[in-house]
Amino acid sequence: MQEMQARAQALISESALRSNLTALARQAGTQLLLPVKADAYGHGMEIVARLAARHPAVWGFAVAVPREAATLAALGLGKPILLLTPPTLEEMGPLADLGVRLPVASLAEAEALPAHARAHLKVDTGMNRLGARPEEAVRVGQRLAERGLLEGAYTHFATADEPDLSFARQQFARFQEVLAALPPVLAHAANGGGVLSFGPLPSLSLARPGLASYGFAPAHLRGVAPLTPVMTLQARVTHVHAVYPGESVSYGGLWRATRKTIVATVGIGYADGYPRNATGKACVLVRGECRPVLGRICMDQCMVDVTDLEVRVGDWVEVWGTDKITVTDVAAWGGTVEYEVLTGLGARVERVAAG
């Protein structure tokens, strides 16, 4: 059977990824534990991991769920993998067999770990999501050390991407108190906001910049390190036709032509992760020009005004990229954040490694 063409492609730039990793490692003063959870923030876990594994600053990878860990381990990239959220007791053995580092936050978990496991102590310093409170974390960490299983310890900053860093500093002080009561371990706390806000932090061996690795920073931290969006999203024109005065486009008739308009139907919609809430605000790049999306964004398609442009079926239009239209723009149009737009990118969008 002939291979079918993708209607939409996410081009993943190796050069942008490498540049971002270099800049963040320099800013942090440590190696990186690169988060590739949620399909590498929508960029494609396998593509990103294969590209990043060749970078000298990447110590290993962090994932959110056991299935991600198993998939990543099967690639055989030779880099450590840390599971960030707790597995069930039944999952501990198989994950340890794969060499996956396991999070531990209780004495019960510390006792249940198989003898060949490697553990990272999860400390809750104020996020109140996962982990042991500092006083309990010390006891858990000491027990893991007694068993010879303690490789690392980590916490997570709740507000490091905000201008006010006072709470993040409190969190880090609590984490340092825990580290002082343990033998030397691989310690990590700084997410992207932490890396950009604080730079090198004492006692830390690794940094975990997530969204920043893919080229995005909070508005007040842009420019601290040179970051470039790694993904360019493009979609094919599937139909070109004329619409005449008084005629409407898409569901609900929200947009109505006041003049003859040439409309291109483009093969991407909200089922692919293009936010429906961006209706009435979104535009795409057609031959380098920002052109408005007309009417409601549909499940599989959207319609674009291409009047006075030379456009044919099969042409690519840029949905977002590095210059005129970014994920930040699309997130603003959709009333959300870059994380949600990127991780919502659907499986129908083909991920392609690019230069």
Curated annotation (Swiss-Prot):
It comes from the Bacteria. It catalyses: L-alanine = D-alanine. The modification N6-(pyridoxal phosphate)lysine is found at residue 37. GO terms for cellular component: cytosol. Its EC number is 5.1.1.1. GO terms for molecular function: alanine racemase activity; pyridoxal phosphate binding. Gene3D superfamilies: Alanine racemase, Lyase, Ornithine Decarboxylase, Chain A, domain 1. GO terms for biological process: D-alanine biosynthetic process. InterPro entries: Ala_racemase (IPR000821), Ala_racemase/Decarboxylase_C (IPR009006), Ala_racemase_C (IPR011079), Ala_racemase_N (IPR001608), Ala_racemase_pyridoxalP-BS (IPR020622), PLP-binding_barrel (IPR029066). The active site is at 37 (proton acceptor), 251 (proton acceptor). The keyword Isomerase applies. Substrate binds at residues 129, 299. Keywords: Isomerase, Pyridoxal phosphate. Catalyzes the interconversion of L-alanine and D-alanine. May also act on other amino acids. Belongs to the alanine racemase family. This is Alanine racemase. It comes from Deinococcus geothermalis (strain DSM 11300 / CIP 105573 / AG-3a).
